[in-house]
């Protein structure tokens, strides 16, 4: 109860301050609605869609963005059909959870300036293990995958633990899986936000 009151009070105060702040002018028409992320969750791999992102930037109002997203959702569901959508969900869940590196180097501009190791000493040693053209990047991927499989096996073999705490963590993971199936996903990096639940379950 204390946690709920504290969280609710904090949210109300922060929300009030944001709505009444004068430092930054906020253009509400540029807000991206939540349904947009459900829409791109239905793209080819269920991940980021440049086409839909561009539409969000070009449409003039929030309602226009919502209408566009609804139309695209209906179009994509109709195109797949029931069996096609079920198959898509299985494939998307595999993409969401299978990669132990959490999609390291698969996307993102932050690494484009450092794909080739150029450092010295310990810095170079790290770069060889994590950069795209590092000599040991394959070793990193292999070890990360082994670690991930072991973590999942520990969780799976711990099914006999039926305490409230364990069940709460399992429900949190199920909720995370469902969230990523409904919204933007398609790669394991989206699973990072749920890592605390995996690690806690694996350690029990």
Where are the regions that the model predicts?
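Membrane-interface anchor segments at the N-terminal boundary of transmembrane helices
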Residues: 97-173
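Hydrophobic/aromatic-rich transmembrane helices and adjacent perimembrane loops
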Residues: 178-179, 186-204
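Hydrophobic alpha-helical membrane-interfacial segments at the cytosolic entry of transmembrane helices
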Residues: 2-17
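Central hydrophobic cores of alpha-helical transmembrane segments
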Residues: 2-4, 168-177
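Hydrophobic transmembrane alpha-helices
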Residues: 1-2, 156-157, 199-204
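Membrane-proximal stem/loop segments at transmembrane-domain junctions that anchor or position
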Residues: 15-119
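Transmembrane helix-loop junctions and nearby membrane-interface residues
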Residues: 15, 156-162, 181-187
